[in-house]
């Protein structure tokens, strides 16, 4: 091919390309004046806008509209024609309904911190490609979400509804959801149907709600076969939820609940679990072998629980000592008995567990006989019942015995006051049973008083009551339950009356940390420190007074020898510097400085020659061109002579 032919071909190609792309430049929209455009990113945020500006370029992909005052009426209909927009930031605006007229291909929508109350199918059906929907910090309630509102959003993966007004989990969520955040709402119940279709869910956050064990369906989590993280922090659970999905669960957060019991099979089959947190609960002991199935456990946090390091916790010490170094366990520090309080379980020797005699000499024994007739049982974890208390004087030696009748079951209770706020309870039963109801109330009256109840399983033989009133009487009762999970005939309780120890008998420290236990001993040295500090302060004041007296005395002698500096006024400095006229330095006296005429001609009224009074040392009071260079007078920054070098 010749050079001329090649050049002609290139020219035609350039011409065709120009005709091909020129319409795009002709039709391109300029950036709105109130916004800034950078390629496909349109920045209209933080401008106090009440509506979305028109004229957004067609090639826009991301709209930044946050921190304005845009309301629902401020979303124009032409916004829907922006087919390339995939991401919109509309948080911190004034929306009160789910916005419409949004681009149909948007995949990520941020609507946090508005006042959105309703979510309708009509609004969500306009964005069928949505993948991430952020609705945190709004006013969405369960009744304000239309049934089936999400049925067309088959690509939705992330749904954030934190800090709203939900009381239940919305029904009909798409099964494609992988992460669901519902923390800090008002959810008290979760029906099994709510989550049964979310088989792809990987992360579920339910922190800060009103959930208890009765509000969770028995199989509510079983279908979540792909769940890897479950968080139930800051709820009202009394034990870990049952039937956790064991296939893929890796993280389980249960801290800041009301858990006082952990069933032996609570974590059965959770072979993939590597992080478990049960801190800030009321757990006193752990059943042996509870962690046997946790083959991948590497992080176990059990801080701030009132661990009772009795014989039943000896296995925990042996288990801790057998763990490999990669397993990190934190928070297993004893609070009771008193002899081991503040010590970590791992550091205890077997003698400190006192497995031969777990109850001290000051225990109280109660034996009672119960009948074999049965009544229907109540819920497994009853809610505590509170009544008006009527406290009577304590009588810790009183023993209750029922009238001897044909014996079917015998229960023996032993109690011991461990600290000013805790009472240790142990019991023995003659026959195996499913569970026992344990209750305690402030005062002696079986009718009046603040009553708290809980259910303990039949395999347990001890319990630690915590957070009690110091030096107060308590009535502790137990009712056995048959294997049929129903109460015995007349619900005759096994009761004992005791009281917590007085404050003076125990160290006031109730924390689990050794450093905090040492604080009372630090306080005992306060009087000695105060005496030493007072003595040092007194000596310092005395020395300061002597120094002041000495300076004052020497200053008086010096002032008598240097009379020229006495009575000097500050304004003399200004007079010497020539910055202020001071008539007091020009004295007209008949005896010392008479005014002498220059000649004998009559002196007119306005012609006078006044001689300046010079100081004895010959230094002129006013500057002149001759003396300025030879003067030894020192000046401050303001041009005023220093008083240490000027004399009057």
UniProtKB/Swiss-Prot annotation:
Domain LRRCT, residue spans: 305-356
Coiled coil segments of this chain: none
Residue pairs linked by disulfide bridges in the UniProt entry: 31-37, 35-44, 309-334
Compartments, record wording: Cell membrane; Endoplasmic reticulum membrane; Cell junction, Focal adhesion; Secreted
GO biological process terms on file: cell-cell adhesion via plasma-membrane adhesion molecules; embryonic morphogenesis; fibroblast growth factor receptor signaling pathway; head development; heart development; neuron projection development; neuron projection extension; proepicardium cell migration involved in pericardium morphogenesis
Keywords: Cell adhesion, Cell junction, Cell membrane, Cell projection, Developmental protein, Disulfide bond, Endoplasmic reticulum, Glycoprotein, Leucine-rich repeat, Membrane, Repeat, Secreted, Signal, Transmembrane, Transmembrane helix
Signal sequence annotation: 1-28
Glycan attachment residues as annotated in the record: 226
Chain ranges on the Extracellular side, renumbered to this chain: 29-527
Membrane topology: Single-pass membrane protein
Region annotation (Disordered) ranges: 624-648
Residue numbers on the Cytoplasmic membrane side: 549-648
Biased composition (Low complexity): 624-633
Post-translational modification: N-glycosylated.
LRR repeat positions: 58-82, 83-105, 107-126, 127-152, 154-179, 181-197, 198-223, 225-246, 247-269, 270-293
Chain segments annotated as transmembrane: 528-548
InterPro entries, alphabetized: Cys-rich_flank_reg_C, FN3_dom, FN3_sf, Ig-like_fold, Leu-rich_rpt, Leu-rich_rpt_typical-subtyp, LRR_dom_sf, LRRNT
Any one GO cellular component localisation term in the record: extracellular region
Limits of the LRRNT domain: 30-62
Presence of the UniProt keyword Signal in the record: yes
Subunit note: Interacts with fgfr1 and fgfr4. Interacts with rnd1, cdh1 and pcdh8. Interacts (via extracellular domain) with unc5b and unc5d (via extracellular domain).
Function noted in UniProt: Functions in cell-cell adhesion, cell migration and axon guidance, exerting an attractive or repulsive role depending on its interaction partners. Modulates cadherin-dependent cell-cell adhesion and cell sorting. Plays a role in the spatial organization of brain neurons. Plays a role in vascular development. Plays a role in cell-cell adhesion via its interaction with latrophilins that are expressed at the surface of adjacent cells. Mediates axon attraction towards cells expressing ntn1.
Protein name according to UniProt: Leucine-rich repeat transmembrane protein FLRT3
Organism: Xenopus tropicalis
Lineage start: Eukaryota, Metazoa, Chordata, Craniata, Vertebrata
Designated gene of the protein: flrt3
């Amino acid at each position: 091919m010749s050079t001329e032919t090649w050049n002609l071909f290139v020219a035609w190609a350039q011409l065709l390309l120009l005709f091909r792309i020129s319409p795009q430049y002709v039709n391109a929209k300029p950036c709105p004046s109130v916004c800034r455009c950078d390629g496909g990113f349109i920045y209209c945020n933080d401008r106090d806008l009440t509506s979305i500006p028109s004229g957004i370029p067609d090639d826009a992909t991301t709209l930044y509209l946050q921190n304005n005052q845009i309301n629902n009426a401020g979303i124009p209909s032409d916004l829907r024609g922006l087919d390339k927009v995939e991401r919109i930031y509309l948080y911190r605006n004034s929306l009160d309904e789910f916005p419409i007229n949004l681009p149909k291909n948007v995949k990520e929508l941020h609507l946090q911190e508005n006042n959105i109350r309703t979510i309708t199918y009509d609004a969500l059906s306009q964005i069928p490609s949505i993948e991430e929907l952020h609705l945190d910090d709004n006013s969405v309630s369960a009744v304000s979400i239309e049934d089936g509102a999400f049925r067309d959003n088959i690509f939705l993966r992330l749904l954030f509804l934190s800090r709203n007004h939900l009381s239940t989990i919305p029904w009909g969520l798409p099964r494609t959801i992988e992460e669901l955040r519902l923390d800090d709402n008002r959810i008290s119940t979760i029906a099994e149907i709510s989550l049964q279709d979310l088989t792809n869910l990987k992360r579920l956050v339910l922190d800060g709600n009103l959930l208890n064990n009765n509000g969770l369906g028995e199989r509510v989590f079983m279908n979540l076969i792909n769940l890897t993280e479950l968080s139930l922090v800051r709820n009202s659970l009394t034990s870990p939820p049952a039937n956790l999905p064991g296939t893929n669960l890796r993280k389980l957060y249960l801290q800041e609940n009301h858990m006082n019991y952990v069933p032996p099979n609570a974590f059965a089959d959770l072979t993939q679990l590597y992080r478990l947190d049960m801190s800030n609960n009321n757990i006193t002991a752990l059943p042996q072998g509870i962690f046997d199935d946790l083959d991948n456990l590497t992080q176990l946090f059990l801080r701030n629980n009132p661990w009772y390091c009795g014989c039943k916790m000896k296995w925990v010490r042996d288990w801790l000592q057998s763990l490999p170094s990669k397993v990190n366990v934190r928070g297993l520090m004893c609070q009771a008995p008193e002899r081991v309080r503040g010590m970590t379980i791992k550091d205890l020797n077997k003698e400190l567990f006192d497995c031969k005699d777990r109850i001290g000499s000051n225990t109280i024994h109660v034996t009672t006989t119960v009948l074999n007739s049965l009544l229907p049982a109540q819920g497994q974890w009853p809610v505590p019942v509170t009544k008006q208390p009527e406290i009577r004087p304590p009588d810790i030696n009183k023993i209750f015995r029922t009238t001897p009748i044909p014996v079917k079951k015998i229960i023996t209770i032993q109690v011991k006051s461990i600290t000013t706020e805790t009472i240790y309870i142990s019991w023995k039963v003659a026959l195996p049973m499913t569970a026992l109801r344990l209750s305690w109330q402030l005062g002696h009256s079986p009718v009046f008083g603040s009553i708290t109840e809980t259910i303990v399983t039949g395999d347990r033989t001890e319990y630690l009551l915590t957070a009690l009133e110091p030096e107060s009487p308590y009535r502790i009762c137990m009712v056995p339950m048959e294997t049929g999970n129903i109460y015995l005939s007349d619900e005759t309780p096994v009761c004992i009356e005791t009281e917590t120890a007085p404050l003076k008998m125990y160290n006031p420290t109730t924390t689990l940390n050794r450093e905090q236990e040492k604080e009372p001993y630090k306080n005992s040295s306060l009087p000695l420190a105060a005496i030493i500090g007072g003595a040092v302060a007194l000596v310092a004041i005395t020395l300061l007074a002597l120094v002041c007296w000495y300076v004052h005395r020497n200053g008086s002698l010096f002032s008598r020898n240097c009379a020229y500096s006495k009575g000097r006024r500050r304004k003399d400095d200004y007079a010497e510097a020539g910055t202020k006229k001071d008539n007091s330095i020009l004295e007209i006296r008949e005896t010392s400085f008479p005014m002498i005429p220059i000649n004998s001609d009559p002196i007119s009224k306005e012609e006078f020659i006044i001689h300046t009074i010079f100081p004895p040392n010959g230094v002129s009071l006013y500057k002149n061109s001759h003396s300025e260079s030879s003067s030894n007078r020192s000046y401050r920054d303001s041009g005023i002579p220093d008083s240490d070098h000027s004399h009057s």
